[in-house]
Amino acid sequence: MSKAIVLDSHLKEKGSVELPKRYEGINSHNLYLYVKHYLSSARANTAKSKNRAEVSGGGRKPWAQKGGGRARAGSITSPVFVGGGVSHGATNKRNYNLKINKKQKRLALEYALEEKAQANKLFVVEKIAIKGVVEDNKRKHLTKEANQMFQALEQRDTLFVCLNMDEYTELAFSNLKKCLVIDVSELNAYLLAAFSSVVMEEAAFQHVVQDKTEE
């Protein structure tokens, strides 16, 4: 059974916690479907080209049908002319969103967590809170403290997951390129797959792994 690594306040390993048994044997195809759903939902349908009906001009026949030695033409909006309409061009009426049901979303999230745990890249800490130093009635050195926390993990990049994240913690990590801090309500399988390691607050971890199959 896969286990998440439990870290102490100094981010040193002090134990482990098992993932629920239902996380085992989940088909990886659920994660593939969720990633396609996530990326397609984020796609902006802005590409647009004009067809021959939308191009301006072309109200009269450019030259006589016969006698000129040239191929017949009825309008300069034809796709064969420079400046004419585009054949089979992009339209902004296509919906790229791919639907996925609630169960598949849950299975994708559970599979992604299981993968991180098997790779020893899933960590649990008691609290993720950056307070900084108060100077002149202002909180300073927030990013410095957040970077020290990230460096102590010795990971390539890290996703931090909090429960009821405060504004100082969010600000502290916002300037770090290889880190992202989110509230547990924003957690999804795509983010879990995108980052090489995940650090979760204990409360956030318990919130995620509780059985939601009967909800």
UniProtKB/Swiss-Prot annotation:
Any one Gene Ontology BP term: translation
Biased composition, class Gly residues, residue ranges: 56-71
GO CC terms in record: ribonucleoprotein complex; ribosome
InterPro entries the record matches: Ribosomal_uL4, Ribosomal_uL4-like, Ribosomal_uL4_dom_sf
GO molecular function: rRNA binding; structural constituent of ribosome
Keyword list, A-Z: Ribonucleoprotein, Ribosomal protein, RNA-binding, rRNA-binding
Family matches, as Pfam families: Ribosomal_L4 (PF00573)
Residue span of region Disordered: 46-72
Similarity remark: Belongs to the universal ribosomal protein uL4 family.
Subunit annotation: Part of the 50S ribosomal subunit.
Function summary: One of the primary rRNA binding proteins, this protein initially binds near the 5'-end of the 23S rRNA. It is important during the early stages of 50S assembly. It makes multiple contacts with different domains of the 23S rRNA in the assembled 50S subunit and ribosome.
Annotated HAMAP family: Ribosomal_uL4_B
The protein, known as: Large ribosomal subunit protein uL4
Origin species: Helicobacter pylori (strain J99 / ATCC 700824)
Classification lineage: Bacteria, Pseudomonadati, Campylobacterota, Epsilonproteobacteria, Campylobacterales
